[in-house]
């Protein structure tokens, strides 16, 4: 009887704590949205630093390191992006869609216990050297074999290799021959990229007169190089951090498969092409700013952006997964991709941050790509992010 009474007492307490926890989260989201500051949490376990910042109440003064899948960049680059607007919690897709319909997204991870000087030593460009001004190559670039003339424009290609995903699997305790389930996203299995399509991407960029720098060839595996468990000494890691920072700061266009690296390029105002392996997952922040353009097979038209932000958009994923569904995504041909590259090259950094103008350009390119309504269109994400090889956007 005593145990039952104890359970009855514990239940209201646990419910109250749970309610307070979720109310606090919603309050935090709304508070940040009102400040116009960009603070986001990738996963549930990242929430504690945000709580500390919330108690301080001055998000703009929080000590930050801009990170993407464990790849931090320097304080100087953070200063380049800190004036944006928006708030994204991947775990609150419907809530933030309602509050922040412009969909501006950046990921920021709040840190404690590290001074700005320490971060500058580890992650920033050399003191006094601004990014994106045709800098001479840093010493690590020379040793890596990278050949570029000072000030020469180039495209940065993030061609992900299968060994990256194998390393992720092993880190998750999954053998490479097992189906990989991304933590937190049910019923999701990863498909390896088609490396032939990266060769096609290189060819298309070459047609647009872009020398291509392959991030993996020059820097190596970002997952192992820029994580706490990175191999090599501090000097080696520091040099690679410096080189990667330089590449992102000075590239003129960024093309990649599924990777957090697109957050870095996008936040620096770099024209970026995206086609993501997780395209079905409409809870991913990238689909907020870079809309997947959907073709209604019954009405024979593209969904409007308003429809994508509306309640109808919430059922899009289910409709696509259902073979009888009426919605399918639009796939770009190589010609449309080349047109998108030319469009992106023409955009200024200011224009990249104007959501409506960018989306109108995206829609114009996509409408040209649709062609006949009954053609076999399967997938494309146009503009402002990256190509995923296995989606065969360039096939």
PLM regions and their residue ranges:
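Nucleotide-sugar donor-binding and catalytic loop/hinge architecture
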Residues: 20-28, 119-156, 160, 167-179
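Catalytic donor nucleotide-activated moiety binding site of glycosyltransferases and closely related
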Residues: 157-159, 165, 184-240, 356-364
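A short, glycine/small-residue-rich beta-strand->loop->alpha-helix junction that serves as a flexible
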Residues: 34-47, 164-168, 186-193
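A structural signal for short, well-ordered beta-strand segments and their strand-loop junctions
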Residues: 31, 61-68, 156-158, 209-216, ...
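Leloir-type glycosyltransferase catalytic cores
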Residues: 102-144, 287-395
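A donor-sugar binding/catalytic signature common to diverse glycosyltransferases
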Residues: 244-289
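Active-site and donor-binding regions of nucleotide-sugar-utilizing enzymes
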Residues: 4-114, 217-220, 243-246, 261-263
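Short, well-ordered alpha-helix to beta-strand connector turns
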Residues: 85, 209, 250-251
């Amino acid at each position: 009887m005593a145990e039952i009474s104890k359970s009855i007492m514990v239940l209201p307490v646990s419910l109250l704590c749970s309610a307070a926890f979720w109310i606090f989260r919603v309050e935090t989201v709304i508070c940040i949205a009102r400040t116009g500051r960009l603070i986001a949490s990738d996963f549930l376990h990242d929430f504690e630093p945000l709580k500390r910042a919330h108690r301080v109440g001055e998000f703009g003064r929080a000590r930050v390191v801009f990170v993407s899948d464990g790849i931090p960049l320097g304080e100087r680059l953070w200063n380049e992006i800190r004036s944006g607007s928006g708030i994204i919690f991947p775990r609150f897709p419907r809530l933030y869609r309602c509050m922040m319909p412009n969909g501006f997204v950046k990921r920021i991870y709040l840190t404690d216990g590290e001074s700005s000087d320490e971060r500058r030593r580890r992650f920033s460009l050399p003191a006094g050297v601004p990014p994106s001004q045709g800098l001479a190559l840093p010493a690590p670039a020379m040793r890596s074999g990278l050949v570029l003339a000072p000030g020469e424009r180039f495209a940065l290609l993030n061609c992900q290799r299968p060994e990256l995903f194998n390393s992720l699997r092993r880190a998750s305790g999954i053998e490479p021959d097992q189906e990989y389930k991304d933590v937190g996203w049910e019923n999701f299995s990863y498909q390896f990229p088609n490396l032939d399509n990266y060769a096609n991407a290189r060819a298309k960029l070459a047609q647009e007169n872009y020398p291509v720098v392959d991030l993996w060839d020059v820097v190596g595996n970002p997952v192992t190089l820029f994580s706490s468990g990175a191999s090599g000494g501090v000097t080696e890691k520091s040099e690679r951090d410096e080189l990667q920072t330089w590449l992102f700061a000075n590239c003129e266009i960024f093309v990649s498969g599924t990777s957090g690296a697109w957050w870095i390029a996008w936040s620096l105002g770099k024209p970026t092409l995206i086609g993501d392996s997780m395209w079905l997952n409409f809870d991913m922040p990238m689909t907020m700013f870079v809309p997947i353009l959907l073709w209604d097979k019954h009405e024979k038209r593209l969904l409007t952006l308003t429809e994508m932000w509306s309640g109808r958009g919430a059922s899009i994923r289910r409709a696509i997964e259902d073979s009888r569904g009426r919605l399918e995504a639009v796939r770009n041909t190589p010609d449309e991709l080349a047109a998108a590259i030319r469009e992106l090259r023409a955009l200024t950094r200011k224009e990249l941050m104007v959501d409506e103008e960018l989306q109108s350009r995206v829609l114009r390119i996509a409408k040209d790509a649709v062609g006949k309504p009954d053609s076999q269109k399967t997938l494309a994400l146009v503009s402002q992010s990256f190509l995923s090889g296995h989606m065969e956007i360039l096939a």
